[in-house]
A protein has these predicted regions:
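Conserved long alpha-helical elements within nucleotide-processing catalytic cores of c-di-GMP signaling
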Residues: 49-53, 62, 142, 164
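Signal-transducing alpha-helical linker
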Residues: 4, 10-13, 56, 60-65, ...
Length: 180
């Protein structure tokens, strides 16, 4: 599966679907979440539950995550240039991506190359991504927020689940897991 994933990344078999985020009061679409899917030429759509853990274990999540971020930013910028109202695009981050030494610069470069205003990008991470990294995580998240984007904790309640601890981090949104 790992060699197939490497080939899939090289040959463009991954696709991004956009799940709309709707204001329940007005019914207006306010944003979307970028969701990566693998369209294998033999198996068809491969479940993220099958390939994301392997991507994490092998480190392939870093180039895959960069591709998703670049693709989602380019698409959101394209929608704006086509006259659509500005939408916030949310992109999930892996802990491995966040640990890359040049990650903040990479995000800034992608925003610059795609022309997407940082205010239209929301990066989502899980609480386990930042827990235990303390001041290092605070500094990195602060640097990301300084770019002008927003940050969200996704699936809160599935891990450490300490609101007191989370107050230390520059987070804009907390998405509570349904099991919390």
């Amino acid at each position: 599966l790992e060699s197939r994933m490497r080939r899939a990344l090289a040959q463009g078999e991954f696709v991004v679907y956009y799940q709309p985020q709707v204001d329940i009061v007005t019914g207006a679409v306010t944003g979307c979440e970028a969701l990566v899917r693998w369209n294998d030429p033999v198996k068809g759509l491969v479940s993220p539950a099958e390939f994301i853990p392997l991507a994490e274990d092998t480190g392939l999540i870093v180039p895959l995550g960069e591709w998703v971020l670049r693709t989602a930013c380019a698409q959101a910028s394209s929608w704006s240039q086509a006259g659509q109202p500005p939408l916030t695009v949310s992109v999930n981050l892996s802990g491995r991506q966040l640990q890359q030494p040049r990650f903040v610069q990479q995000v800034a470069d992608i925003l610059g190359r795609t022309g997407l205003p940082a205010s239209q990008l929301k990066l989502e991470l899980t609480e386990s991504t930042i827990m235990g990294r303390g001041e290092e995580a605070v500094a990195q998240l602060t640097d990301l927020r300084a770019l002008g984007l927003s940050l969200a904790i996704d699936d809160f309640g599935t891990g450490y689940s300490s609101l007191a601890y989370l107050k230390r981090f520059p987070i804009d949104e907390l998405k509570i897991d349904q099991g919390f």
